Amino acid sequence: MPDMPAAILGLILSLLLPGGRFNAYFTPAFTDAAYQKEAAAKVLKAWKPPASQPTGKKTVLIAQIAKDGTLAGLRDHLMTGAKSWDDAAIAAVRHAAPFAPLPKSWGFPTMEVHFHFEVAAK
């Protein structure tokens, strides 16, 4: 099996959320912009902002998308400490899955993407 590309990630999408900002970072070797936009849009569509929001913090989740588009893994990298915000971010990624199958040209079993859910500073 070939080695995975370096974990340096490239920003593909940055959008405003109610009360904050959403960023999606994909492995740079994964250059299918249409797929990236579609995957990020699915997460954003599944986002349900909580009533209470922490100030000036962010949740960072690292997802592994399998060849068939299923969520092969999801782990937290950084949490705000505000359970409602962190849980809403996790739920958005889980509800967005499954994603479209990875392109046949992608020569790895999974693709990594980091989803950032930032709370606006007040």
Question: Over which residues does each language-model region extend?
Answer:
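Intrinsic-disorder/low-complexity signature in envelope-associated proteins
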Residues: M1, P5-I8, L13-E38, K48, ...
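Conserved "boundary/linchpin" sites in short secondary-structure elements
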Residues: L17-F26, A40-K48, Q64-L78, D87-P101, ...
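Short, small/polar residue-rich loop motifs at catalytic or cofactor-binding pockets
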Residues: P54-V60
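Residues that form or flank phosphate/diphosphate-binding pockets in enzymes
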Residues: S84
